[in-house]
Amino acid sequence: MSSSKALQDLIPHGYPIRGCFGCGADNAHGLRIKSHLECDEGVATWKAEPHHQSFTGFLNGGIAATLIDCHSAVTAIALHCQEIGLDLDGENAEFPDGWTKTITIDYLRPTPLEAELTIRAKVVKRGKKSRTVACSIYADGQECVRAEVVVVIPSAG
């Protein structure tokens, strides 16, 4: 997958996931994260806005969970596509269905609202029709949130 486009922007128009609050390219009111593959890891940077806060100056935990959910799922699906040789950036590209089954989150420290966040996700286990992803959110080089996410990919089996 050599495209410089964000993974979310490779999802064909008309797919329902494009309206997702967290990662939907067509949701003007959503978080609109942009994930990219760097070797075997999904990486995104994202900047919160004032309305994403919990306590003054800190990111809301639900927003952090949404960032992890969406980034982990799109990373798992894109890496699956890479494994099977499916081109996501071609004229007739298709994006396999997938969804988050479970998320286990550890909030390690408050996530500062003003920092540019880096989100990193890596597949750590392959099941027959699922991928387990380790995902973390970093602010100023410090890990703030760590999660394990199980993503179901029906076409993987």
Which residue stretches match the model-derived regions?
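A generic structural signal for short beta-strands and their flanking turns/coil linkers
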Residues: 40-42, 61, 99-103, 115, ...
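Hydrophobic residues in beta-strands and at strand termini
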Residues: 46-48, 107, 153
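Low-complexity, flexible helical/coil segments
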Residues: 70-72, 79-86, 104, 139-141, ...
